[in-house]
Amino acid sequence: MDGVIVNSEPLHKKAYYNMFKDFKLDVSESLYESFTGKSTYSICEQLCLKFNLSITPYELVNSKRKHFKYIFENDKSFKMIDGAFELIKDYYKNNLKLVLASSASMLTINKVFEKFDLDKFFVAKISGADLKQSKPNPEIFLKAAKISGHNKKDCIVIEDSTNGIIAANSAGIFCVGYKSKNSFNQNYSLADLVISNFNQICFKE
């Protein structure tokens, strides 16, 4: 969802760095970029191990989500990525089944879907936060394919992150790597197709 449907990454980054400040964590830009595509819990678990923290990952998660909630509700610049809404409508109109498979929490997913009125276009939503393994584990995409009712060879994944692309590749599902102006230091080498504009994958194409 983040980086493909909405550009909430700047909001998440603000929330994470506020959380880092709360707990006095010195997180480099390169370390932060390596988190892209992972669930909040997985990231916080990694932070606890790296910095040898005596607190639980859930304490970090709660701090980050508190900051994100405030930023989400007050940042007027938050909007959908150019062309994303048109692509969703195009696929829906042509009877393609859409399943959202995101590392974001279901709370965040529902907030985004409510804000942009997206529920009617999707047959299901999956949060990686509710699964045993986070991306780059393929579990989330295998579950999405199963929910769609189609063989995975007839499905596609649209991803903007290294971890998501690895997960799709490991699942054996055709992966479209979306390389946008907001994509930083992500590896698209395992993507089956790399695009920079959603017009490149509209239904007629």
Segments from the language model and where they lie:
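Active-site neighborhood of HAD-like aspartate-dependent phosphohydrolases
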Residues: 1-33
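Conserved SAM-binding loop
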Residues: 5, 80, 98-101, 133, ...
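Short beta->alpha linker loops
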Residues: 11, 35-39, 79-83, 104, ...
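Phosphate- and divalent-cation-binding pockets in alpha/beta enzyme and binding domains
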Residues: 15, 43, 83, 108-111, ...
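Anion (oxyanion) recognition and catalysis
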Residues: 21, 92, 169
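A metal-dependent, Asp-based hydrolase signature
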Residues: 37-71, 90
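Short, acidic loop-to-helix structural element flanking the phosphoryl-transfer center
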Residues: 70-100, 106, 110
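Asp-based, Mg2+/Mn2+-dependent phosphohydrolase catalytic module
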Residues: 89, 105-205
